UniProtKB/Swiss-Prot annotation:
InterPro entries: DXP_reductoisomerase, DXP_reductoisomerase_C, DXP_reductoisomerase_N, DXPR_C, DXPR_C_sf, NAD(P)-bd_dom_sf. Belongs to the DXR family. It holds the Pfam family DXP_redisom_C. Its cofactor is Mg(2+); Mn(2+). This is 1-deoxy-D-xylulose 5-phosphate reductoisomerase. 1-deoxy-D-xylulose 5-phosphate binds at residues 125, 151-152, 176, 199, 212, 217-218, 221. One of its GO terms (biological process) is isopentenyl diphosphate biosynthetic process, methylerythritol 4-phosphate pathway involved in terpenoid biosynthetic process. Its EC number is 1.1.1.267. The lineage of its organism: Bacteria, Bacillati, Cyanobacteriota, Cyanophyceae, Nostocales. Gene3D superfamilies: 1.10.1740.10, NAD(P)-binding Rossmann-like Domain (3.40.50.720). Pathway: Isoprenoid biosynthesis; isopentenyl diphosphate biosynthesis via DXP pathway; isopentenyl diphosphate from 1-deoxy-D-xylulose 5-phosphate: step 1/6. It catalyses: 2-C-methyl-D-erythritol 4-phosphate + NADP(+) = 1-deoxy-D-xylulose 5-phosphate + NADPH + H(+). Catalyzes the NADPH-dependent rearrangement and reduction of 1-deoxy-D-xylulose-5-phosphate (DXP) to 2-C-methyl-D-erythritol 4-phosphate (MEP).
């Protein structure tokens, strides 16, 4: 039985991971849980899965959490704040830590888990995008496994099983196109938050659903794929695949193309990250190609999705620039969700901030450099919002 700690237990990734644990009680057990601020849900999870340790990031919610499980015996260790989440990530006998926290907030818990010798089921792409210069050397130093748990990188990882490293020629990341794949560019000026949250295929959290609408999600995945699989950016391609049945593809040196297919269900990549190298029988709906029907593909519209181009440029710039891109995107999306900026302001804010970082880009950033760049970028987005009257795009990193 594999012991698991789950960081980000009340979010979309967390609840789907716990669904897997519920279905396979002989395969997996929960050692630790950490969540953001949802006391009621975390308390219910503690009651059901009986972890040895749990943490809530919002320190003011700790008394309420203690009260909610006061009758439990034995009591788990209860912690709060960022330090508490980090302690959960490194705690005890967990073999694998699932990182389901949204955004760069997952970086420090992931580092703590790696340093404690835990394998990582990586569902938090921002950790690697911002922190790869620190995270990857630590993975090698401590001899842990870094297993992708999001659909696209899991698909690539699955396709690569048995393929020699020298055999990989190209990666093709599929994208649904998000909420606006069939909209004319001119309509994007009138996008509402409700519009952006209507993903056609996947059930995800609010932030990642907006990222899908801007295609920043796919741009970030390009950077993640570069770090995970070692390909140059010119050999990583995005293709729009509206049905979300093919989760990604690889092209080999002899022009053979391998793909991983399945219904759009995040539990599949999560289960594989937890069970690898084994395959566990499930009773989930099996893919019926006749039912799926036509599988279509098209090139992404670069005018509609400027965030995609930004991500490629930032990835090639390297250093601390990806941390700035990620933080600026998180801040801009948060402002959009709070209806403080418009949808089209998201890429403009990000581009403005990345441009201002070019002269300060650190080629080999330390953890302190990355955290400082993250903090700086979030503040700069607020400055950028004051300059949004300029009608044209502000800068070009290319």
């Amino acid at each position: 039985m594999k012991a698991i700690t789950l960081v980000g237990s009340t979010g979309s990734i967390g609840t789907q991971t716990l669904d897997i644990v519920t279905q396979y009680p002989d395969q997996f057990r929960i050692v630790g849980l950490a969540a953001g601020n949802n006391v009621e849900m975390l308390a219910a999870q503690i009651r059901q899965f009986r972890p040895k340790i749990a943490a809530i990031c919002s320190e003011d919610k700790l008394p309420a959490l203690k009260e909610a499980i006061i009758d439990l015996d034995p009591q788990p260790i209860l912690l709060a704040g960022e330090a508490g989440v980090i302690e959960v990530a490194r705690y005890g006998d967990a073999q694998t830590v699932v990182t389901g926290i949204v955004g760069c907030a997952g970086l420090l818990p992931t580092i703590a888990a790696i340093e404690a010798g835990k394998d990582i089921a990586l569902a938090n792409k921002e950790t690697l995008i911002a922190g790869a210069p620190v995270v990857l050397p630590l993975v090698e130093k401590h001899g842990v496994k870094l297993l992708p748990a999001d659909s696209e990188h899991s698909a690539i990882f699955q396709c690569l099983q048995g393929v020699p490293k020298s055999g990989l020629r190209k990666i093709l990341l599929t994208a649904s196109g998000g909420a606006f794949r069939d909209w004319d560019v001119e309509r994007l000026a009138d996008v509402t938050v409700a519009d952006a949250l209507k993903h056609p295929n996947w059930s995800m959290g609010r932030k990642i659903t907006v990222d899908s609408a801007t295609l920043m999600n796919k741009g970030l995945e390009v950077i993640e794929a570069h770090f995970l699989f070692g390909l140059d950016y010119d050999n990583i391609e995005i293709v729009i695949h509206p049905q979300s049945i093919i989760h990604s593809l690889i092209e080999l040196q002899d022009t053979s193309v391998l793909a991983q297919l399945g219904w759009p269900d995040m539990r599949l990549p999560l289960l594989y990250a937890l069970s690898w190298p084994d395959r566990i029988y499930t009773d989930w709906e099996r893919l019926d190609l006749v039912k799926a029907g036509n599988l279509t593909f098209r090139e992404p519209d670069h005018q509609k999705y400027p965030c995609m181009q930004l991500a490629y440029a930032v990835g090639k710039a390297g250093g601390s620039m990806p941390a700035v891109l990620n933080a600026a995107n998180e801040q801009a999306v948060a402002l959009f969700l709070d209806e403080k900026i418009r949808f089209l302001d998201i890429p403009r804010c990000i581009e403005w901030v990345c441009d201002r970082h070019q002269n300060d880009n650190r080629a080999n950033p330390s953890l302190d450099d990355i955290l400082a760049a993250d903090k700086w970028a979030r503040q700069e987005v607020l400055t950028a919002t004051e300059k949004l009257e300029t009608p044209s795009r502000i800068i070009s990193l290319r």
